[in-house]
């Protein structure tokens, strides 16, 4: 059986089935034509350029609502995490030590594990220049200044919970 596929300029496709000559001539096949057409043409809506096509999603009755919320959605069910530079912590707390907990965060100035390489090196030497510290590091609360100089450590804000940790808001009337 041979098949040919043609795409018409109107956006429809056509598939033809042509029978081959079988060895047994008692079977007769009738060639058929299958024509596919869009149910509705896309509506043209004006956007900033005036040329855009706007398509709507129409859910059929057999679509399964897999989240049990009574909503049908075309969104992917996952959380996107922005890419981070190499060497930057992947946790929300920006801590380089995975063993630290919230109880330890009160004593972070005295904790030598929370100092970065450059800022801990100048504890040993007499060179007390803080020019190497970037403004970005100071804003993000990454640097711990020397306790000997009277510098204050910047407070870190508590990490906000991610979408899996948040409890959904409920209305009390239901």
From Swiss-Prot:
Annotated InterPro entries: PPI_Ypi1 (IPR011107)
Keywords for the protein's UniProt record, in alphabetical order: Nucleus
Alphabetical list of Pfam families matching this protein: PPI_Ypi1
Biased composition, class Basic and acidic residues, residue ranges: 123-142
Gene Ontology cellular-component terms listed: nucleus
Biased composition (Acidic residues): 94-109
Subcellular location: Nucleus
GO molecular function: protein phosphatase 1 binding; protein serine/threonine phosphatase inhibitor activity
Region (Disordered): 1-72, 84-174
Function: Regulator of type 1 phosphatases which maintains protein phosphatase activity under strict control.
Record's protein name: Type 1 phosphatases regulator ypi1
Taxonomic source organism: Aspergillus oryzae (strain ATCC 42149 / RIB 40) (Yellow koji mold)
Gene: ypi1
């Amino acid at each position: 059986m041979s098949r040919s596929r043609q795409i018409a300029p109107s956006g429809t496709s056509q598939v033809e089935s042509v029978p081959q000559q079988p060895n047994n001539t008692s079977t007769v096949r009738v060639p058929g034509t299958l024509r596919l057409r869009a149910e509705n043409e896309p509506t043209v809506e004006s956007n900033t350029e005036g040329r855009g096509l706007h398509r709507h999603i129409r859910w059929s009755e057999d679509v399964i609502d897999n989240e049990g919320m009574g909503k049908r959605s075309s969104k992917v069910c996952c959380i996107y995490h922005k890419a981070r530079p190499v060497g930057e912590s992947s946790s929300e707390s920006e801590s380089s030590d995975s063993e630290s907990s919230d109880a330890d965060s009160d004593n972070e100035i005295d904790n030598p594990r929370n100092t970065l390489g450059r800022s801990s090196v100048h504890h040993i030497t007499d060179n007390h220049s803080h020019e190497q510290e970037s403004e970005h590091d100071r804003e993000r609360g990454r640097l711990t200044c020397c306790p000997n100089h009277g510098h204050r450590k910047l407070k870190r804000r508590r990490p906000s919970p991610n979408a899996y940790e948040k409890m959904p808001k409920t209305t009390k009337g239901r």
